[in-house]
């Protein structure tokens, strides 16, 4: 069953002769529960693609359907609510709120929804993330790996249908990297969430169900490696 | 340009908004300093021009110098400009209609002397030959002699002396003697020294050497400096080449060189005082001190703004400076980059500020000059205009530059200490602890998650906010203190000049001898429109309860059952006044002259200010007594402690609320009985010596031009200690104008200081928002809607404003209370706060903070989330 469909997506920076085409007529679709790795060299447009899918950047043209809704027809408030409830975005540089502690950072999407986090669910999540004894710490009191796990927790707390991860392990050592990836895979399998992950790491890419290769803003390859 | 400088300029350009706001701050600060300095010099200049107008533009005169010694004086290094003057003396004006202006008084000047002695031509031309004169317009106006241009004057000129041969000094008023029959006759004569003929060629305004009381009307003639014989002598009016206190030594020394003595030197103290050249100099010192206090306040407010701007800039650039440091920038280079920033801002801001300051002052002075005129009594054609001197410009530049230097000093030192490691570490974030950002659970429950984040943000950057909260507090306190003071002064001034029905009062003390003569002289002044001569004595009347009004009974206790002793003023007015007063009241004046059956007109009106239960002052107005025409009362003049004083039966001839000029409305314990002079003299005839001494004499005047009349009266009565002059109209007007005048300056000052504070708030808030761009983008990326973003900003503004109010309000209230206590001695009113000012101030603080926040977040809200997230804070 299809969860995400991208149609003729273009993103251009600048105009005229200096225009840079970060995305050039990209179209593909991803099914529910699929784990897709996006690979490509620096500046190939893969991060831009991810951001546009996540609703934090705007395409120059083209459409993005998530669960049948074209997200760029939504107004700003509805788009914010879409981000809050449907998408979990994980950045390379964690982007945590410095004044909020681990628990608050993780439950941020719920708090913005004025909802109370489910205690048991939160505890389970903290346990899986290995942050149980760090729940009251501020981001600056954590290591890089821990901070990344907090940002993963934040992406997962709403059990969003779509998980987007932009080189989540780019800044981490190999041990932490492995932990993070297996964590993401576990959620992908357990909750049947769709996961799109950008990586430079060949080994990580090989763990995915499908690999999409992007060069110069175009899809150069799209192969399913396991079904 | 070296790399440090270009880096600095780039960062200024990158933070265009903050740079502009800081430059505006510098402009305002320089403008205010310029305005204060400009006002100070303009005001002194006004005083100088006024002194020149009234006494001429010269510093000293050496009298009666022989012609052969002229060059000794004129070409002395101590002398800048010199003109010759010759005093030809007095000649009788035979047909004068003014009994006090019986002479013409002639002085001659060399050509440039007319200008230097402030001779103002009214018609015709100035004399250019020895046999020509221009006469004072007072000859026509006061003495009533109409000369026409071209008429010939035959003058027997000479000195005045008394009949027994004593010399009368110039400018003394005409000397009268009393003969055996009590009639006045002129007690002086003129000793003729020369007889000459002159042609009238022009009419001039009253010259500086003619006073309104002078016995002679002025006239000026021409003196040819080339036509002196060696035996002639003349007065030399001079300006000193070096104007300071040393002239009190150099000029007398010069006089001695010219064969004269120090006694022949007179200084133009009037003018010298306004140049600050006096032996002791209070006014000058006071003005200087006042200007300095204002400038210090301006500098403090400006430093708090500009310091903040530099501190923010250094904090923002710490990563940049750290990187520069890691590739080898020295401490000196880092420090100088901040000073260069200050230099750049100053080079743009200070010149603009000085222009703005002078421009603003020119407009303000033009607007308030008419008000000021009534406050400081200057000659009619001297007005306050802006004067720009090189010295005041230099002072403004130096002070503004100093302000910037002080502001940049600490940030520059901090910049010099930035190390490479600071660039790598985000120092502030590291220090953040859980405890610092801990908030009550209640906040989130009651106000929502946004409020909680807002509060945490506030707590996080406590230090950064401190300077801005300080600015908030300073502007709040300044504003509230001034408005509290203004409203208190308002309640005070309302009551002061109520019920006065004359313009100028001249009162005599009881040892004044020739009062009648002085009354005549005063009444003869051409500016007096009407006058009332009065005498009054206070005493008591004993009355039964039914004769006393209900109001009076409320305020006065009976001395025994049903009997009241109430104050009464027995007042006489001159016959002319009495006749018209009786007419106004509807009585027949003839009935009031019978000294066997004395009667008077009862003024039965009282007015009082009254407080009840600590509430506001209330004005009460009504009858004092229940008396009717035909009733009698027993008047007892006050006589020390003697209770058994003799009483006089007086009849009430009429009862009225009308008052003759000079009589004031009484309070409820007293009334006034107006009688004729004849009756008054009869009643007071058998007074004891003490009682006679308690009689007060005065003359009250109405006029169209109280200021000129007051000056004339001052000149007329000069030196007479027994006379005091009260210009009620001018006092009331001055009081009103002073409050307007002060209002313009004080509120102008407060507004500009507030603008600096607002600029400060704007800078810190917008920088703070800019630094948190990434964080805001983060919140939006995880799904914060614009609505809840606004909610968060709103809460942050409110918390922020509240913090300012938390400190500002108690301080303001405390100051208001102190002010209230200080003015308790003047008028006792209950302590109240100017609620509307407080409400306004509170609202303004919140609005300013909120508007700034809104403005600062406007761009951020529209910004692409990803662009903000990519920002690395460099």
Located regions from the model:
Chain A
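ABC family nucleotide-binding domain
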Residues: 2-214
